[in-house]
Amino acid sequence: NVSKLSFCDEFINKLPDKYETIIGENGVRLSGGEKQRLSIARAMLKKSSIILLDEATSSLDSETESKIQEALKVLTKDKTTIVIAHRLSTILNSNNIYIIDSGKIVGSGKHEELLKKSELYKHFYERQIQK
């Protein structure tokens, strides 16, 4: 079930009318994290061959992000996936990572390669992951 895979069922079942609840301006307002989880669920329902994730986990706490990362593995399996992220935890397992600084690609490679050859990437990694 897509709602379980995207962890939407956790908040949907707490809504007044559960899956029948009207959301949006004239209904119940969702948090940023709930909106992101709902967007991921919608993407799972579409059978797209290309997935674009733009800051897909930026409004999530670390625990929920970890759960969503598992859901994203299912969503992106066998699909071309482009991930735009400032959180390195979102991209650590990517096949190829591009570092963009001031609109220019200043580095590319896998995580381990970038740790060795990019001071900028290493700096972000040390600040975010190795606290």
Segment roles from a protein language model:
Residues 2-6, 18-119:
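ABC-family ATPase nucleotide-binding domain "signature/switch" substructure
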Residues 116-131:
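C-terminal boundary and immediately downstream tail of ABC-type ATPase nucleotide-binding domains
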